[in-house]
Design a protein with these regions (language model features):
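Short Gly/Pro-enriched turn/cap motifs at secondary-structure boundaries
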Residues: 91-92, 157-160
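Glycine-rich phosphate-binding "P-loop"
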Residues: 7-18, 79-86
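Short, acidic, metal-binding catalytic loop of nucleotide-sugar glycosyltransferases
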Residues: 30-37
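Active-site-proximal specificity loops/subdomain of glycosyltransferases
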Residues: 49-106
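Residues at the starts of beta-strands that form the adenosine-phosphate
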Residues: 39-40, 110
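GT-A fold catalytic core of metal-dependent nucleotide-sugar glycosyltransferases
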Residues: 95-147
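A glycosyltransferase accessory/donor-loop signature
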Residues: 1-12, 20-26, 42, 50, ...
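Short, polar loop motifs at secondary-structure junctions
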Residues: 44-49, 73-75, 119-123, 231
């Protein structure tokens, strides 16, 4: 039934402004350096794969991805505003509306799905593959400058339910819990406007974090319970879109320039070592392309 016992799944769909496939290659190589369960599958579309073959060497593609799932897709419109420091922003297509299909498409019995901008710097997530946990995610996050996320990244509404991050999702495909979760996620996605009204969250962007959080809430019986496990450490580290990358001394040794969210002209440097980090500023990752290739060899 499964092609492989366990591994890591990445999803990359390029658009006109962000080379997600290249970022995915960096994330994959980082995982391979840090984790024992490091068989990596890339889920992508024909447009992105064609661009990969033009912009990346065959050696880089082969060393990054052990398996590639390619589909011909017409992505639903989903426009997102990105930031590159507090002073630069741009909008572009964000193709994420089929993320719930990872349950059906993963070639693994036990899957760790990570977003392409999640860089693994240690092996703490390896422990999940040795457990009977059916499904796990992060609910809490702290920035590399030790700020809490904005309120809409802690809750769907100030008086509403907790937000769970869909940045990292682990599941065992044999479990009924995982099957139910992804089925409800799909239902929420198909009825997103209704759930947006019901849970009173703002914005026009389809957020997988919100869809997954509603699925968790429904599975929990619409109360706080422990139906969904939390990933090791219980806290996801992230760098904000307004943060910049100063230096990669190594894939597990990164220095960030972090503006104060309320006073962005005031900044600090934060050095993160041997941690897994969700690096939201994708333009900053691409700027360090050459250095990343050096440290990931």
């Amino acid at each position: 039934m499964y092609k492989f016992e366990s591994g890591i799944l990445l999803i990359a769909y390029n658009n006109s402004k962000i080379d997600y496939a290249k970022i995915a290659a960096f994330a994959s190589l980082a995982a391979k350096k840090s984790m024992a369960n490091n068989h990596v599958t890339l889920m992508t579309d024909t447009f992105t794969l064609d661009y990969m073959k033009m912009s990346m060497s065959p050696e880089l593609i082969a060393s990054s991805f052990d398996h590639i799932i390619v589909e011909q897709l017409d992505h639903e419109t989903n426009t997102r505003t990105h930031h590159d420091s507090p002073w630069v922003e741009f909008t572009t297509q964000f193709s994420n509306k089929n993320k719930h299909t990872i349950f059906e498409k993963s070639p693994y019995r036990k899957t760790l799905m990570i977003d392409v901008d999640y860089f693994i710097g240690n092996n703490t997530l390896d422990i999940m593959f040795d457990t009977d946990v059916p499904l796990a995610m992060y609910k809490r996050a702290v920035s590399v400058a030790n700020y809490d996320p904005r309120i809409w990244e802690q809750k769907l509404h100030p008086d509403g339910i907790d937000m769970w991050w869909s940045t990292v999702v682990y599941w065992n495909a044999d479990s009924e819990e995982a099957k139910l979760f992804f089925g409800i996620w799909e239902h929420v996605k198909e009825n997103y406007d209704y759930y947006k009204w019901l849970y009173k969250f703002p914005g026009s962007l389809y957020r997988t974090d919100y869809a997954a959080s509603i699925a968790v809430h429904l599975l929990n019986g619409q109360i706080k319970s422990n139906f969904i496990d939390q990933l090791p450490g219980h806290v996801m580290r992230y760098s904000d879109q307004i943060d910049d990358i100063v230096q990669f001394k190594g894939i597990n040794d990164v220095t960030f320039l972090c503006p104060d969210p309320d006073k962005p002209w005031e900044t600090i440097c934060s050095r993160i070592k041997n941690e897994n980090v969700h690096i939201m500023n994708k333009a900053a990752i691409i700027r360090h392309h050459d250095r990343l290739l050096e440290v990931l060899k």
